[in-house]
């Protein structure tokens, strides 16, 4: 096979979503061999860990993975498998694009933003402690190398994908050292990309501007915490997490996955919308250089959504997960306009 991809179906509705996505990607004619591996709560019973070694080895070997949603056990002392994956492979860039999907009838004229969220530091580095019974403290750690590499990654992605504008989101007016450093590193990285328009925007103003007029933004680079919050806000602008794709990327590998959870209450019902994982799969195809197949899948998906006949319940239809996938495949075979 031309490409070998580690497929992690995940939990809850994950396996049925990933099966639908695999059908669509295979139907596009791309030569992919899928290597199936497990992750999550099922593995805890089988292997005594949420993230088995053989899954890690498969991703390390193939350097690319498509992953379904997993369930993070709350309050069990087990770290989320997602967080562990990010640490093991140093997946420092969380890439979350949002685009206007006409069928979702959102009020914006234009929405086409790629968010680049720093994935390894900031106040999410899990350095928290109780100072006394009544005082809790959290350390916000920002480093120059961590900040520079996410900025450079975003600027390079922008250049490679024909994007024009990259803005850094921060709160350096108040957090002069930490966010100040993040902004400084961004400006230093930007010097290598004179062809790209760069600037910065304060996070609270950015939130307001996103809701008022999201069409003004192109690419945003964000520290971890603001990135977590604003990427979900952007998913809302787009019409919800059912269509929000994502990728976690490092220097040696990339894991593509939806942002949404595993919705265990719907497991096995073939009810949920696989679009977020499908669009993540489309991102993966572009990453692998299979641009033509990626475009075909995307156009077919938009057409099926526009027609609104064979779509899932969350967008007003009655189609099952696999029926929606089948409709997309038929559109592709009919020759997408």
PLM features per residue range, with description:
Residues 45-140, 225:
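N-terminal glycine-rich phosphate/adenylate-binding segment common to multiple enzyme folds
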Residues 11-14, 63, 116, 154, ...:
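Buried hydrophobic positions in well-ordered alpha/beta secondary-structure cores of metabolic enzymes
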Residues 32-36, 161-170, 193-201, 290-298, ...:
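Flexible, glycine/charged-enriched surface loops at secondary-structure junctions
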Residues 21, 25, 186, 277-285, ...:
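Buried hydrophobic packing segments
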Residues 41-43, 210-312:
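Glycine-rich phosphate/nucleotide-binding loop
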Residues 31-54, 208-210:
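N-terminal beta-loop-helix "entrance" segment that forms/cooperates
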Residues 4-10, 65-69, 166-172, 279-286:
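Short glycine-rich or small-residue beta-strand-to-loop segments that form or flank ligand, phosphate
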Residues 6-27, 132-204, 216:
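Glycine-rich phosphate/diphosphate-binding loop of Rossmann-like nucleotide-binding domains
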């Amino acid at each position: 096979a031309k490409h070998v991809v580690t497929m992690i179906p995940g939990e809850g509705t994950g396996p049925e979503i990933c099966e639908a996505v695999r059908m669509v990607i295979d139907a596009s004619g791309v030569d992919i061999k899928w290597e199936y591996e497990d992750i999550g709560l099922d593995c805890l019973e089988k292997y005594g860990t949420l993230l088995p070694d053989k899954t890690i080895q498969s991703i390390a070997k193939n350097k690319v993975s498509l992953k379904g949603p997993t369930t993070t056990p709350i309050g069990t002392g087990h770290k989320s498998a997602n967080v562990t994956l990010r640490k093991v492979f140093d997946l420092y860039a969380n890439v979350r694009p949002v685009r206007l999907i006409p069928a979702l009838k959102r009020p914006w004229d234009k929405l086409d933003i790629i968010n680049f969220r720093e994935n390894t530091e900031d106040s999410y580095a899990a350095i928290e402690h109780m100072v006394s019974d009544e005082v809790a403290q959290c350390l916000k750690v920002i480093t120059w190398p961590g900040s520079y590499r996410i900025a450079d990654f975003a600027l390079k992605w922008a250049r490679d994908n024909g994007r024009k504008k990259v803005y850094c989101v921060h709160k350096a007016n108040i957090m002069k050292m930490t966010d100040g450093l993040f902004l400084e590193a961004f400006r230093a990285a930007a010097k290598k990309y004179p062809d790209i328009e760069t600037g910065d925007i304060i996070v609270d103003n950015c939130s307001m501007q996103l809701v008022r007029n999201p069409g003004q933004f192109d690419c945003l680079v964000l520290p971890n915490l603001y990135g977590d919050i604003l990427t979900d806000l952007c998913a809302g602008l787009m019409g919800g997490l059912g269509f929000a794709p994502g990728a976690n990327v490092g220097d040696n590998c990339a894991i593509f996955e939806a942002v949404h959870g595993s919705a265990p209450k719907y497991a096995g019902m073939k009810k949920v919308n696989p679009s977020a994982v499908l669009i993540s799969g489309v991102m993966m195809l572009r990453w692998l250089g299979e641009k033509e197949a990626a475009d075909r899948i995307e156009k077919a998906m938009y057409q099926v959504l526009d027609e609104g006949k064979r779509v899932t319940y969350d967008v007003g239809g009655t189609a099952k997960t696999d029926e929606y996938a089948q409709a997309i495949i038929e559109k592709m075979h009919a020759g997408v306009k």
